[in-house]
Amino acid sequence: MGDPLGIGPEVVVKALADPAIRRMANFVIYGRNETLLAAADRARVGLDWFRVDAASERAQDGSVLQPLVLDYTSEGLLDASRPGPTRFGGLLSKAFVEDAITDAMRAPNDPRRLDAVVTGPISKESWSIAGFKWPGHTELFAFRTKSKRHSMMFSSPRLRVALATAHLPLMDVRNVLTIGKVYDPIDLGHQFCQQLGIAKPRIAVCGLNPHAGEHGMFGDEEGRVIRPAIEAARRIGIDANGPFPGDTVFIAAAAGEWDLVVAMYHDQGLIPVKLLGWDKAVNVTVGLPIVRTSPDHGTAFDIAGQGRASEGSMKAAIELAVRLAAQRRTDWSSPHPRGLGQPGVAGDAGAMAASDDDD
């Protein structure tokens, strides 16, 4: 349910109060029972669930459509009267997701195994206060699943965007951008689009600099880093194109000319996604052996506990997770795209290694 002091509990109960959502899957909520009860009361939604202590053994009955709440209330008292970043909120929200990852990684015949994980919003500041080195969910999932190649991606009705870099100061982007960091989201995003039924995805790659560098006048990253990554992808049959100026490529993508845009940094990709797909966009971590999605918003401490949060993005995240999990059930092979340095793909090992810490 994400940070217990944010809007995560509210959007969870609102989403699961929808009978159409509840019929899609059997749900296990990792959270605090008292927090969920309070959220349901404030939002005035009716939702029944089973509760078990998080520390107890449990097995989910596949025929039961009521959610199962793994209750962490025994972990300690939580002051919900003042929403905001806290050490305890960080400890709890990390415990929720750590246990969910453990259950998603269980053997296929284990009754506790999850087919997908949909994460509620966490506070990166709370995680930092609690002493965790991970800046967010994406990095933790990659570490726990031993996924060397992964990318943060956003899917909305009008745009799909994958990021070459994510949670970095803007001044650092040009220093960490490598051929591998640009190649990975092209390759992984291509596979994701194919999972959605797009046989031959058309991919546009953004430049880093104004006017995509204007032939080196405003920077050399386009020719030195981005174009070689595009060429490597094209050599294995990926329809990758660019680099294009970031201020115009999203217009064409929103009009349907591109199935995926690869952005070089966080705000370059997320501003158009949220502008055009607010309340419907979903964050997906591509490249993992498990399915992980999340709503595209944060904890919104400023409106937490007021019953005002929209559950639209959480519903969309659940719907996409169910779709991806169903697809994987018919094809148990997890993503194993070719990285730079493997047969059929040109590149240097240094660039590939540098991409291991991508978001």
Residue ranges and their predicted role:
Residues 144-159, 288-302:
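Short, flexible loop segments at boundaries between secondary-structure elements
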Residues 125-129, 149-151, 160-163, 170-172, ...:
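Short, well-ordered, mixed-charge alpha-helical segments that flank or form enzyme active sites
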Residues 1-137, 182-264, 268-283, 288-291, ...:
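Contiguous, glycine/small-aliphatic-enriched amphipathic segments in soluble metabolic enzymes
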Residues 140-148, 170-194:
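Active-site glycine-rich loop that binds ribose-phosphate moieties when present
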Residues 59-64, 154-183:
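Ligand-binding beta-strand-loop-alpha-helix segment within the catalytic cores
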